[in-house]
Swiss-Prot record:
InterPro entries: 4pyrrol_synth_GluRdtase, 4pyrrol_synth_GluRdtase_dimer, 4pyrrol_synth_GluRdtase_N, GluRdtase_CS, GluRdtase_dimer_dom_sf, GluRdtase_N_sf, NAD(P)-bd_dom_sf, Shikm_DH/Glu-tRNA_Rdtase. Possesses an unusual extended V-shaped dimeric structure with each monomer consisting of three distinct domains arranged along a curved 'spinal' alpha-helix. The N-terminal catalytic domain specifically recognizes the glutamate moiety of the substrate. The second domain is the NADPH-binding domain, and the third C-terminal domain is responsible for dimerization. Pfam families: GlutR_dimer, GlutR_N, Shikimate_DH. Belongs to the glutamyl-tRNA reductase family. Pathway: Porphyrin-containing compound metabolism; protoporphyrin-IX biosynthesis; 5-aminolevulinate from L-glutamyl-tRNA(Glu): step 1/2. One of its GO terms (molecular function) is glutamyl-tRNA reductase activity. This is Glutamyl-tRNA reductase. It comes from Campylobacter concisus (strain 13826). PANTHER family: GLUTAMYL-TRNA REDUCTASE. The gene is hemA.
Amino acid sequence: MHYLDISFTYKNTDISVREKLAFDSDEKKEQILKLINSNKNIKESMVLNTCNRVEIIASVEDVKAATAHIIRCMSIFSGVFEDELYERADIYENSGAAHHLFAVASSLDSLVVGETQIVGQLKNAFKFAYDNNSCGEDISKIIHYACKCAAKVRNETQISKNPISVSSVAVAKAKEIFGTLEGKTAIVVGAGEMGELAAKHLISSGAEVIIINRSSERVEQLVDSLGDNASWDSILKLKEYVNNYDLIFSSTAAPHAIITGEIIEPREFHRYFFDIAVPRDIDLLNTELISVYTVDSLEEIVRKNLALREEQAQKAYSIVGQDTSEFLKTLKEDMSVPLIKSIRKQAEICAKNELEKAIKKGYLKHSDYDEAQKLIHQVFKAFLHQPTMKLKGLADEERASELSNGVKFLFDIKDEQNFQAGDIDEI
């Protein structure tokens, strides 16, 4: 088994391509996972989809064949040519996949380093794949360690102190433009997670917020939680709001743009649109009186954030490196456990059979059986110590699979039993 992570992020893929790759509905995610898992080289898979990244995480039998299949599946769904996907993708396997995923979970690979949303998004992506029978023990193990690593980074560094997100960066840019947001009214389109964060940051900066949403139930609850500086209205009045206010943030789950040139009317004041959705909500060109900022165009503030957190990021990467090594060590031992257990079980059965023969033939008294069994156990425990240590180190050897198969042949082991690392006592 090999771990594989095929990654498309803001670093290697611009937003115009990322939005084509976005699996922005449960139906799309379910379809892509079924298609990916239809190949014999894929054991398990999950898809992580955020505004800044689309990643396929999988456990596979053959890395090259599995990569080709996954790229082909993504090309079918997105309409992007396979050659372009290969050119853009960062492809990680085994230790590289673990290190990358741990860094992602710890928000070190995020556009906004230190943002706190990613670990929740990772957990939700795993839960969706698990609930849809797309992943199991292999991916469960690496996600568990990734979340554990993220918690350690959060607790042992200050990288998430004063946590920020894409939404907060967008609000910071608005403050930079206007000087202050005190007394301003901002329009937030969408009441999802990103919209909620934008509204909170706007209100904390002194602005009043009007949230525009399709469903009344969700937005009513949100407005109640935000207090007196928040109100809401129907998405049916979107045209009215985008033409009468100068500060608009949009983050809906719509599969297509909802703010287009068709609903924009000429005005004599400058309007600023912040599109923090992927796929994009806003399809407008920058003009003399209209400025549009997307996720990818907030880089200057992001760079400042990265510089401020550089020292903490170095500490965090050290933790990621340590946790990656620990995970690989555990994985290595887990891989050898069934084989080790099978050899020990075979030795126990052989010893028991010989003891029973000795008693039947009168070579050994019944009263000596327990003592003889203890002695034999100690003998084969000592005898198997060195082979056990060697087997636990097989994952570090280039010929690990070949050596493991050789051991199975020598001991005539047909089927290894499924045990966990905790089942093996220290020998």
